[in-house]
Amino acid sequence: MAYGVPRKNTVKTILRGSCYNVQEPWDIALLAKTWSTNLANIKLPFLEEISFGGSVQLTKCTTIKDGLLPSAESIKLEREYEVKRLCKLKCQENTSKEIQLLLRERPAGLRRPLPSK
């Protein structure tokens, strides 16, 4: 497997934050081989296909098409809730804009010193 300059640089940038030091492209190939053998030695059921390079066979299952649709009343209630929520968000945005405008108009000056005792 040949590593071109862009791929080599990409892998180097990925590995830059890790404990591995990559100098040459073949180091990357050796590192990938080490990782795959370590994963194969873990002996987890979903990783055993990595050692053989095979694909995982998926079993067929039937899907149920009689999914319950929401009732008209629940759709109406959800719509009302969303309208209220969006209205509340809009009000919050408007008040934050008003506060920002008021703060900009207010002259900012230095604090007066505290009177001496």
Curated annotation (Swiss-Prot):
It comes from the Eukaryota. The gene is C4orf36. It comes from Homo sapiens (Human). Pfam families: DUF4522. This is Uncharacterized protein C4orf36. InterPro entries: DUF4522.
